[in-house]
Amino acid sequence: MAGGSVIDRLPGRQAAIAALVAARRRPGEEWVGSLLHRLWLARGRPEGLAAQPRDLRPADASAGRQILAGAFVLGGETLAPGQRGDPWNRPSPSRRFAVLLHRFGWMPDLLALGSEGAAEGLRLTLEWSRTFGRWNAFSWGSEVLERRVFNQACAARALCARASDAEFACIIHDLSRQARRLLEIDEGPARAAERATAAAVAGAALAGGGGERLLAEALRRLRRVLPASVTPDGGHASRNPQAAVELAFDLATLDGALAQRGLTSPDELLGALDRLSGAVRFFTLGDGRLAAFQGGESLDRAYVAAARLQDSADDRPSPATRNGYHRLESRSLQVVADAAAPAPGPWSVSACAQPLAIEVLAQGRRLIVGGGWSPDAAAAQAMRLVDAASTASIGDAACGEPLRGFAARALGPRLDDIAYRVESARREAADGLWLEMAHDGWAERFGLRHERKLYLGVEADELRGEDRFAPVRETADPAGRRFVPFTVRFHLHDEVQAQVARDRKSVLLRFGGDDHGWWLRSDALEVTLEPSVHYRLGQPRPTQQVLLRGQVRLSEGARVRWKLSSAARADAPS
């Protein structure tokens, strides 16, 4: 075949890994779909319910009322089976919707309505069991099984309070089988802690020898995988701030369920929970939402506030750096910078190849943001590339891309081998904060190193930046190029209005109702405004981006300097 085999054309070392995973998957699927496997999962039937795990995430009663009225609204899409309709026997609007539906993340919204919601939750759970109680690759796959086990375990007592004896037996038996299947899944380190936690929550909820054995096995697994999932400084190994919040919620739920059973939580659990609580504190910005990097969303304020309620040291000052991120703060400005490489290998399924990206808040409101991509957003994989972040790019090149085709189907949409290195150095003084960052993601293709310097003046209350492209290649460019174009992007929050000044070098950024705003000035050759999109709570919102364009001579390099300052304290450009 021209161009080599399919395996030869796959990117990097991921080819061999993808082939191995695909070869192992088919026999495994045949086993889990067999009668013998169903009997294996059914061993050690639970005798009843023990703990009542409490999911500490806030519920949305209005969403529960929509379900009672006959409509599931998930991820911005709607399925309307009607009152007491069956959502399981009809096609979902999209695969993404089906994932959210089968995860049962909507169950807390129903239970927030009391007995009426619990009755509907019981009916929907039994309908699911009749349709999907036997294994299939989608509804019993790890993408949905992990969250469904957690959600059903937390809902079990409320549902069973209205169940007949036969329905009660069905619910606890299904929960036990699903949790046992969850412990069988071995897809590498990514989400291993989340799977073990969900299985342990189910084990804590189930009474009798079957529940106790399930709990013991899940806790053994959790003790083993937690150190790899939570970094020593408290971040999630994926470098996704939202992942840290979600795992903190799950571990807090498990800690509470173990306490109900009179059991002491393992030291590994308590230590990880303490470190994750510190990460939640670090990533919570002035608007009460999260910094949105590496596949994490900013989330709703109430959601983040609920996570912070679990932090016994919430009043402690947060460190200036954590998990590869830096925070810089003055009176009115708050800056977060991504100063590390994306997570490697299996941890990168939600990672973004966007080195040195920043987010900026002005007076507690988002001003400069990233694209806001997340695995649950209705966004293209292109939103994980460098152009979708507030950083610099050269030509039309990417610093890394998600796997595609066969490799993506086998391994998930992890980033292809990321070879670039990121360096950072920070200095602090009474009058200002300096952060110097650099990465060599453009070195192989262009012979250039991107260096970004940030200075936040504490007294002046302004942010100064310099993006420099420094040559690292002593020989001529192999392609014979002398110049290549570069772009420095600033994606704006969808609530920000932008206007280019008459000098064509400055852009006025204003929030609605703000009389002054902020000037973004630069010495770029060309300054333009172009359309952009920002994903918030998983939904696209049209916005704009400021582009600073120029040309870099490969033998000499180039730089562009810019400054963000309050329009209330600065003269307007002429």
Predicted features along the sequence, with ranges:
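Long, acidic, intrinsically disordered low-complexity segments
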Residues: 39-65, 78-112, 191-204
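Carbohydrate-active enzyme catalytic cores, enriched for enzymes
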Residues: 200, 231-373
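CBM-like, beta-strand-rich accessory domains located in the C-terminal region of large
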Residues: 2-6, 146, 381-574
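Short strand-coil-strand connectors
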Residues: 75, 329-333, 363, 395, ...
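Catalytic core of carbohydrate-active enzymes
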Residues: 336-420
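Extreme N-terminal leader/anchor segments
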Residues: 1-82
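Residues that flank catalytic or metal-binding motifs in active/ligand-binding sites
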Residues: 102, 324, 356, 388, ...
